[in-house]
Amino acid sequence: MQSQSKLTRRAAAATLVAMTMCLPAAFAAEKSFDRTLSVNGPVTLRVSTGSGYIRVSPGSDNQVHIVGHVKSGGNSWLGWGGSSDDAVAKVAANPPIDQAGNIIRVGDDHGNDWAHHVSIDYEVTTPANTMLVAQSGSGDLQISNINGTVKASTGSGSIHAEKLGSGSRLETGSGTIDASNLMGSTTLQTGAG
């Protein structure tokens, strides 16, 4: 009986340790930001994220609207000196968005340490004639009704594309590509999907 009791205690301890390790992910911080940028002509837009999704659709001819959903990676113990909650708050307060006229970059981390501790999902509306580059390390891409050339790539996510401009290129390392109503020539490439 005593050995069975020891096994029960060990199993309970192992369960407690496993649950404790999962708690940071279960209670991960999350915040959002919302920005609208004015443009006055053809737009060149670059959107990148490490592990989030990217959705791009057409909107107003003179605005780019960006909504970001920032989530912590739960990696506060990796030595950057701050908590995951701090990283999420910093990104939400000062999103990684740069604009130089009609050239807009979204998601470039500019060497910030927080970039390794958060995941950002992007929902973007932009003029239909935008030239777009969208990259995600491991998230899905959904792009529709963009008449400009689109270069979209993801390492391990899927790509859903509809009505893209001629000369577009869609690539995924290990996901699937679902594309329809593409204009002109378009290159589709998948590694293992």
Annotate each predicted stretch with a short phrase:
Residues 2, 6, 26-49, 53-136, ...:
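Acidic (Asp/Glu) and glycine-rich low-complexity loops/linkers
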Residues 9-10:
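Basic polycationic patches enriched in arginine
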Residues 13-24:
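Bacterial N-terminal signal peptides
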